């Protein structure tokens, strides 16, 4: 889908833009972000959103099916976007259940740090830049490298 980001979790698809696709293709739900911060008027399905602080997670947790917390590590694709949390803050948030199975780690996730995500108590990891860097949509035609890398990450996270 051109101009749309998709998140796949447990073989279910959430659209981050073009919310009409949710109904048209019976997708799992929609994801709210700064560009699309409100759900459609009569929408009643699965909703997730991105948060940028632990307080925001705590305040929004009861209103959404799950949340992304970002940036956990320095962003791979956006220069100057650095980690918003210390390891101790994340450990403590996991112990106090602010971070739990409904909170997904986003930002700078790579094979070097994906195992830490489990230790902090996150329900999963959102991998973007690390995968994007494995494939150039303008020049590459062979998806095998990005598929291999995804499988490697998935195996590490399982």
Write out the residue ranges for each language-model feature.
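Helix C-cap/helix->beta junction micro-motif
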Residues: 8-9, 43, 99
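Expand to "…catalyze enediolate/carbanion chemistry for C-C bond making/breaking, isomerization
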Residues: 158
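Histidine/lysine/aspartate-rich catalytic loop segments that bind and position anionic ligands
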Residues: 47, 53-78
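Charged helix-capping and loop-helix junction motifs
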Residues: 81-91
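Glycine-rich phosphate-binding active-site loops on the catalytic face of alpha/beta enzymes
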Residues: 32-40, 68-81, 114-153
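S-adenosyl-L-methionine/SAH cofactor-binding core of RNA-modifying enzymes
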Residues: 31-58
